Amino acid sequence: MNIIQTFEAEQIARLVSERPVPEFVPGDTLRVLVKVVEGERTRTQAFEGVCIARSNRGVNSNFTIRKISYGEGVERVFPLYSPTIAEIQVVRRGDVRRAKLYYLRGRSGKSARIAEKARSTTTETAAAE
């Protein structure tokens, strides 16, 4: 590992210790709580939608969330380790077979729905024990 990769690994470890990042993949519905500064006040704003893409590039990793707001599609790209993100919550797990879900841009209504991933029984029984 060269010095740049070592430095990036240390930075990622530091950032994850400050704010843990949940495991999520494209197709999952996420709620991202973003810190918004208005004058002197700071508040958190929720942005909930389907993760349509994720780019794993070390410290520069990002993910794209798409939601429908008042009939218009809204997409937002979030840097994964950004200090403006207060929290990332996984609302539901989606069952998709693609890494990039850009085809959802051309769909609306029922055709844009994503099936929920069935829960595995092995993890539930292991958690019960």
Swiss-Prot record:
UniProtKB keywords: Ribonucleoprotein, Ribosomal protein
InterPro entries, alphabetized: Ribosomal_bL19 (IPR001857), Ribosomal_bL19_CS (IPR018257), Ribosomal_bL19_sf (IPR038657), Translation_prot_SH3-like_sf (IPR008991)
GO molecular function: structural constituent of ribosome
Pfam families assigned to the protein according to its UniProt record, in alphabetical order: Ribosomal_L19
A cellular component annotation (GO) from this entry: cytosolic large ribosomal subunit
UniProt entry tagged with the keyword Translocase: no
Residues of the signal peptide: none
PROSITE patterns: RIBOSOMAL_L19 (PS01015)
Alphabetical GO biological process terms: translation
Function, as annotated: This protein is located at the 30S-50S ribosomal subunit interface and may play a role in the structure and function of the aminoacyl-tRNA binding site.
Family as reported in the entry's similarity comment: Belongs to the bacterial ribosomal protein bL19 family.
HAMAP family: Ribosomal_bL19
Protein name: Large ribosomal subunit protein bL19
Annotated organism of origin: Granulibacter bethesdensis (strain ATCC BAA-1260 / CGDNIH1)
Lineage: Bacteria, Pseudomonadati, Pseudomonadota, Alphaproteobacteria, Acetobacterales
Protein's gene: rplS
